[in-house]
Every structure is written in structure tokens, then in C-alpha cells.
Amino acid sequence: MTEEHSMATDALDEILSRLRRVEDELAITRLIASYGPLVDSGSADATAQLWCADGEYEVEGWNMRGRDEVRAMVESSAHRKLITGGSAHFQGPARVDIDGDSALAVFESLLVLRDGDRFQVLRASVHRLQLRREADGWHIARRTGRLLDGGAEARELLATFAQEQDD
């Protein structure tokens, strides 16, 4: 192999590696963006499939483990009451960092509910997702959510990537 051929192969490998990272980030961004429409439409099975089979969802003192518990949350009477009254689980843009077959994402979200002729923000929160690449694509291994109430736990999630910015 000539030196030119070796350099071209290295350059192609670099481009393919960068393309894979971009494709992975896009897949994760799409997964995050799909949560709101799925949960607001009451699509329990599709919502549950966003998680790994052994995935966890911890939000405001509620701990769900596995797809069955996520599905049960979407099918619950409390959730049904939210969505039949008119709701929007809006997920803001996510910061996504990928490391091989695992990734970390942080974003803010709003839960907006219809109140007569108006809409009101019921909840503002921050979420940190640990994701895992599986045979059929990216899934949530753990999702942790905290209310943006000024508390230390929410600020800690918000600051997930702050160390990088300081370096």
C-alpha cells in the first residue's frame, strides 16, 4: 500500500466515523422529539419502546423500571385525564454527547395544559437521558427528570456539561 493510498484510507475512515456520529446524534434527537407526540397521543406501546427493556424513568418521585411500567404510566387514568383535556409535552433542544454505544443528553421540557380557551404551563423541568445503542437502534437506558424549581437537583442536571465548558 502506498503512502497516498494509506492517507486516503485514513481520511475516508475519519469521514465515515464523523458521519456515524452525526447519524447517531440525529437518531437520538429524533427519539427525544418523538416522546411528546407519542405520550400526548396516548401511544403507550410506542412510548414504552423508546426505552431499553431494562430502562428506567425517574421523575418527581415516580420511579418506573422497564417498558411495562412506562406503558402503564401512559395508560394510567391520571395521564389519560391530562391528554383528553389537551396537553403538550414539549421537549426543548437537547445537548447530546456520544461515546461509542452510549450517549448522554440533557434538555428542558414544558408540560402545557389546556385550561378553557387558554393554555397554561403546568410544569417546567430538566431531563438527563442516558442512552444505549442496541441491535435495533438507540433507546433510553435511564431518564431522570427534575422540576425547575430552583433546587440543587435541577441545577445539577442542568450543569451536566458545564465542566466541559470550563475546560
What is the role of each PLM region?
Residues R18, V22, M64, R118:
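Charge-dense, low-complexity intrinsically disordered segments
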Residues T2-L16, R80-D167:
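A beta-strand edge to alpha-helix "cap/lid" segment located at domain peripheries
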